[in-house]
A protein has these predicted regions:
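Aromatic-residue-lined binding/catalytic grooves and analogous aromatic/hydrophobic interfacial grooves
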Residues: 1-354
C-alpha cells in the first residue's frame, strides 16, 4: 500500500554513500559548465510503501478455501473477492475514492455472525510509529532518509474499523472483530508534501498530516457506505465512460483473464475472445491512468503508484526518455486530458528551480 507523496530525499550509491561528481580528465572550465547545468545532487529518493493491511481469519477452520475468485470491474473501478470456507461464502469488496481520498474494504458473509477477523497494520518504515485505540489504528512518522537536514517530509495514516460485531484493540496494531455480519474498513493516508509553483518554499508545508487524515476518516465514517461507493463510481465513470472501443467480431467473454492471455500468447483463442481481450486491455490501460494520475496528485511514476518496500526497482522515479511517454501517451488519445494535469503541473513546478 502506497501514499503517493511519500519518498525519501537523496541520491546514494549501492553502499548508501552520497554520490559525488568528479571529472578528473576534463578541464576545469568544462566541469564548471557541467556543474552549472546539473540539478541538486540530493534527488528525491525512493517512492516507498507506507505499509500493509492484513485481514487474518480467526474462524479456527483447518479447511482449504474453495471457489476462490477475484474480479476487477474496470467499468466501475471496484474489486471483489469471494471464497467458500466450511460452507460459508465470504465476500470482500474494495475501492479507492478520489473525491473523498480514502480506501474502503467491506467484508460480508452469508451466515450470521461468521466474520471473526483480526485487522492489523504493519509498516516497513523504520521510523513509523503504530498505535491502536478502540476501533482505530494510527501510524505517524517520516521516511528514513540520507539527508534529514533537508528532507522534512512527514506522513500519517489512519484506519478505522466499523462493524456490527464485537471490537477489541489488541497489542499495538490490531483491531479484533468477533461474531460480525459485516466489517467495513476505511483507510486514509497523507503527507505534508505540497507542490510549489515558485521557489518560495521547499515543497513541505506546515500541515500536520495526522490532522488531515483524521478529519477525512471522521467525515467518511459519518456517511453511508453505499453513498460513498456511488460517489466513487460517478467520479470514475465521468472519465472512463467517455470512450468505448469496438472491434469486429468481439463479444463478451466469461472466460478468466488468465485463460484469455494464455490463449492469446499461444494463438489458440477464438477470434471473438482475442478481440474481446484487446478491448479489455485497452480499457485496462485507461483504468490504470485514471487510478494513478488525478488532479491534485503527483504524476504517475515509472511504476504508476504501485510499488513494494523501501527500495523498489528504479526508485521508482520519472524517466523522461521512456516511462513518462509510456504512461501518458493515452491521456490525450483516449480522452483523459484531466489525467495529464499532474504531469504538466509537476513540470511547471520545476521551472523556477532550473
Amino acid at each position: 500500500m502506497n501514499e503517493f507523496t511519500e519518498n525519501n530525499s537523496s541520491y546514494v550509491d549501492d553502499d548508501g554513500n552520497v554520490v559525488s561528481y568528479d571529472y578528473p580528465s576534463l578541464p576545469q572550465s568544462v566541469t564548471d559548465a557541467i556543474e552549472a547545468l546539473k540539478g541538486d545532487k540530493n534527488l528525491y529518493g525512493n517512492y516507498q510503501s507506507i505499509g500493509d493491511i492484513y485481514i487474518d481469519d480467526r474462524s479456527g477452520s483447518t479447511s482449504e478455501a474453495e471457489n476462490y475468485r477475484r474480479v476487477l470491474d474496470i467499468d466501475n473501478a471496484i474489486t471483489t473477492l469471494t471464497y467458500t470456507l466450511d460452507g460459508v461464502e465470504y465476500t470482500r469488496e474494495y475501492f479507492v475514492s478520489n473525491p473523498d481520498n480514502f480506501m474502503a474494504i467491506r467484508l460480508t458473509a452469508d451466515t450470521e455472525g461468521a466474520l471473526n477477523k483480526d485487522i492489523r497494520f504493519t509498516t516497513p518504515q523504520p521510523l513509523g510509529r503504530i498505535s491502536v485505540e478502540g476501533d482505530t489504528i494510527t501510524m505517524t512518522g517520516r521516511p528514513q532518509d540520507h539527508r534529514a537536514d533537508i528532507d522534512h517530509l512527514e506522513f500519517a495514516l489512519q484506519l478505522k474499523v466499523i462493524s456490527d460485531g464485537e471490537l477489541e484493540a489488541v497489542n499495538n496494531n490490531i483491531v479484533r472483530v468477533s461474531n460480525a455480519n459485516e466489517i467495513i474498513i476505511y483507510m486514509s493516508a497523507g503527507t505534508n508534501y505540497q507542490q510549489c509553483m515558485d521557489d518560495s518554499f521547499d515543497y513541505f508545508s506546515d500541515e500536520i498530516p495526522l490532522d488531515t487524515v483524521s478529519e477525512r476518516i471522521q467525515t467518511v465514517s459519518a456517511k453511508d457506505y453505499d453513498d460513498l461507493k456511488q460517489a466513487h463510481i460517478d467520479d470514475y465513470r465521468e472519465l472512463y465512460a467517455r470512450v468505448t472501443l469496438s472491434l469486429c467480431g468481439a463479444t463478451q467473454s466469461d472466460r478468466s483473464t488468465k485463460f484469455l492471455l494464455s490463449g492469446y500468447r499461444n494463438d489458440i483463442t477464438s477470434v471473438s475472445d482475442s478481440r474481446y481481450l484487446e478491448i479489455l486491455y485497452y480499457q485496462f490501460g485507461r483504468y490504470l491512468l485514471i487510478s494513478s494520475s488525478r488532479e491534485g496528485s503527483l504524476p504517475a511514476n515509472l511504476q504508476g503508484i504501485w510499488a513494494d518496500g523501501l527500495y523498489p526497482p528504479w526508485n521508482p522515479d520519472y524517466h523522461a526518455n521512456v516511462n513518462i511517454q509510456m504512461n501518458y501517451w493515452l491521456a490525450e488519445s483516449t480522452n483523459l486530458t484531466e489525467c495529464h494535469t499532474p504531469m504538466i503541473e509537476y513540470i511547471n513546478s520545476l521551472v523556477p528551480r532550473g
